[in-house]
């Protein structure tokens, strides 16, 4: 069974990640620590994922950053990787290799966990993390502080 691993790449001790009006995901992906990860294992972790899951808001922000990027180290991984968006309002997903999971969260996660290699990376957002935690579905939490 595949592990569900929630990642928090950008975390702040004071709770502030960006000023009001900042495009959050663009800000996150433009951080030097994310543009040039000092740990090759971070890229290996993302590359070896079976699927990358996210909520609608995170999907819209990440897709907006990664589909237009020509030089970000995460772009090739995410653009080619399998992505699943958890949303009951999103009707279409234009980002390649993306499906929408609109059913019961626990059942959708169970389907993703079945099978062989790789793990499932949870990118965000907060509503999805909360649902997954409330349902006790997260196997591991990886936090990076800058």
Predicted regions and their residues:
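Portal/gating segments that form or line small-molecule/metal binding sites
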Residues: 1-140, 145-146
């Amino acid at each position: 069974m595949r592990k569900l691993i929630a990642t928090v790449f950008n975390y702040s001790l004071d709770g502030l990640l960006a000023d009001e009006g900042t495009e959050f995901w663009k800000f996150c992906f433009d951080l030097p620590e994310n543009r040039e990860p000092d740990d090759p294992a971070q890229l290996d972790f993302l590359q070896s994922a079976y699927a990358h899951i996210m909520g609608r808001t995170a999907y819209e922000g990440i897709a907006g950053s990664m589909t237009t990027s020509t030089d970000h180290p995460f772009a090739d991984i995410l653009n080619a990787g399998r992505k699943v968006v958890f949303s009951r309002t999103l009707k279409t997903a234009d980002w390649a290799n993306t499906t929408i999971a609109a059913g019961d969260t626990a059942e959708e996660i169970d389907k993703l966990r079945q099978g062989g290699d790789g793990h499932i990376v949870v990118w965000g957002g907060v509503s999805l993390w909360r649902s997954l935690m409330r349902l006790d579905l997260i196997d591991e939490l990886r936090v990076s502080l800058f």
